[in-house]
Structures are given as structure tokens and as C-alpha cells.
């Protein structure tokens, strides 16, 4: 499987005539996956707000005081397990937990490890996103049984400095290396709609597809424009352009789960359907993604029923 994709190659894919691009993406998708299957995951914010980072898209940053998010303490383990049971009963096979930290403190990491162990005991796969990790922390999470660690690249290396100044691109790559070395599956993607150009979008997919090993899960987010954040006034993304990014991700990373993440609340059913045709085969289920709205579970169920698609047990 190729891990040497170039930006120019990805840009050429994205620029293909739409029918040709969709045909190629669907062909790649069918070679590895059941095209009628969608994986369901649930995401819970276990520690919200107060983050010292300055990510321009994120209302959880303490630097964006008008973002409308009040800082909270880390949730208790049993409260998290209650949410996990509800997610399992609603059909989720993977439970993802996110904490608004630059990096976790050791005592907080131990609490998260207890959460991981508890969720695993419910028969669910686990994923956490806690910010930057060192090698020791990654191995501790693996000891607890963690299946996946999410740490996104967000955008291209060139556009990155326009979005974040408190964490470097290399620091993100270093965390991903620690996660891989610990034997944890990688969940890594980015965000579309942050003022980037077409070349940046190709650069994001090329960066993901040229990692030493393709991420097992690739969440592609559509920017949720939150009042009070620097990107609140960003231009909306053409739905067809977004579908093109999904298709390019599927072609370049044929064995990865490509996940529709944040921004689905603003997508029409028709736009989501095109994303599924382009190779997206995973969604987040539930009314919120960390602090932003997500489609109601009933809307998702109705759409999947209309399309004759079914949900699956989590595997990537």
C-alpha cells in the first residue's frame, strides 16, 4: 500500500471530472469494504473548555473568551461509563472520549485509563483524544487497553501556522509516532473550510497518506463556524468540493475508515449520501461532537434506512 503520495498527485485526483472521481473512489471502496455498511461511533467530551491552545476553530480554547464554552473538570469515571452504556444501547460500537488539554497530567491520565478499562468491559472499542503524548504516556494508555488515539493534523503544513501557533506540526507528528510505537491504532484527519485553498486541501490528504502507516481511521471534519472564534466568519465549503476531499482520501488510503465527523449537522442528506458514495464509511452518532451540534440519531437512522445501508461493529 502506497505511503508516498505527493501533493500534486492528490491535487490531480481532486480535479478529476466528478463522475470519474466518484467511480474511482467507489471502486477502491468496494475492493476493501461492504459499500452498504456504516460504522457508528460516539464521542463524549470528558473535560470541556479551558484549553491553553489557540486553535482558531475551537470554542474550547481559553484564548477565545467569546466562544461560549465554560470550562469544566474531568468527568468522574462512573459518569463516563453511564454515557458509554447509553451509546452502546443506541448502536455505537466505539466510544471516543475527548479532553481539552494541551497534554494530560499523569494523575488525569490514570483516571482516563480507568475510563478506558471500564468502557472496554462493556464490549466496546475505545478511542481517546487528550492532546500531545510522550512515549511513556502512550504506552500507559496501551497497557489500559486503548484501541485508538485521535490526534489530527488539521490542515496542510503550509496553512497550519494560520490556524494554530501554540503547537507545531512536528509536535503533532511526534505524538502520532509515539502512538504508533506503543501499538495503538491511529485516528488522524483534518478540517475543511478554515480558509485553506485547493492546494492546502491536497496537502492535508497527502500528509495523511504519506505517514509511515496510513491512519486506521481518518476523520474529515467540515468546519463548524462557532461565534466568538477567529473562524466564525469563514466562507462555507461547496458540498461538491467537500465530497471531492472524501473521495481523494478514500483513493489514497484504501484500507482506512474515512469518517464524516464535525459539520454533518450543516450537511443535507443528499450531501452525506454523496460522501458515502465517495467512500466515507463511518459517522459519529449522537447529539453533540464535543461542543458542536450533530444530527439527531433518529435523522441518521432514517437516512440510512432510505439508502438501504446498515451499521457495523467497529473495526477501524
Curated annotation (Swiss-Prot):
One of its GO terms (biological process) is biotin biosynthetic process. It is an enzyme of class 2 (transferase). Its cofactor is [4Fe-4S] cluster; [2Fe-2S] cluster. Pathway: Cofactor biosynthesis; biotin biosynthesis; biotin from 7,8-diaminononanoate: step 2/2. Signal peptide: none annotated. It catalyses: (4R,5S)-dethiobiotin + (sulfur carrier)-SH + 2 reduced [2Fe-2S]-[ferredoxin] + 2 S-adenosyl-L-methionine = (sulfur carrier)-H + biotin + 2 5'-deoxyadenosine + 2 L-methionine + 2 oxidized [2Fe-2S]-[ferredoxin]. Gene3D superfamilies: Aldolase class I (3.20.20.70). Catalyzes the conversion of dethiobiotin (DTB) to biotin by the insertion of a sulfur atom into dethiobiotin via a radical-based mechanism. Belongs to the radical SAM superfamily. Biotin synthase family. This is Biotin synthase. It comes from Gluconacetobacter diazotrophicus (strain ATCC 49037 / DSM 5601 / CCUG 37298 / CIP 103539 / LMG 7603 / PAl5).
